[in-house]
């Protein structure tokens, strides 16, 4: 399968072909074998925190609230907010965890076997219904837990940075542009994303091959292009005199204001 993927990427994209040769064999490894509920709960814990701080919170959560085992959805819903706060969760994350637990018990977030039977789009639609879970989080689950082969996380900063570096661009590509360009990598866009992540590492090590082609990025339709652009800056208002200026070298007579007519005093009767 890896040979088939590399052959396909090299056939449809010469820049990707050189990147694959520099990065070496594809190595997308499964991160863990947790249930979708636990994967998403851990993702919520990691939001806006570094890995060490998030893992410390999860360790306290498992030890104090689950007696060494990750709490089930029912057990999480039975916990008081004070217990979750003592573990280190913020109020917004507590609300997200409770919503995740409730939707897991109702079947919106299915077990792994049911999840495998759904398409990528169906999984994204169902899991992003959970509070605090966005498209990127679900795409990471698709790539690393479910090993789906055709996922391109266009909003991922590392993927966009890798594309900019590998393709010799002056700026980061817009997510919509990256999505349109990356359509040629299907049905192996997960592998392409992995190689774009590797492009960042190769660039830091000074081993990234230069882009030899003039890459033509797809143009967005007019409505999307306007949305992708930055809002225009507001121009400062400059006071302009209402009186027109005379051309250079032309003498003009200054206009005097009209004289006010004085009324004659009324005669006394």
Predicted feature descriptions by range:
Residues 42, 59, 63, 98-102, ...:
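Generic alpha-helical structural context detector
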Residues 30-38, 88-91, 182-189:
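Structural motif
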Residues 35-39, 75-78, 123, 178:
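Alpha-helical scaffolds flanking conserved acidic
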Residues 37, 41, 50, 54, ...:
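Hydrophobic (often cysteine-bearing) scaffold residues that line and stabilize catalytic clefts
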Residues 29, 37, 53, 68, ...:
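Short, surface-exposed helix-loop/turn micro-motifs enriched in polar/charged residues
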Residues 1-28, 120-121, 135-269:
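C-terminal accessory module of base-excision DNA glycosylases/AP lyases that mediates lesion recognition
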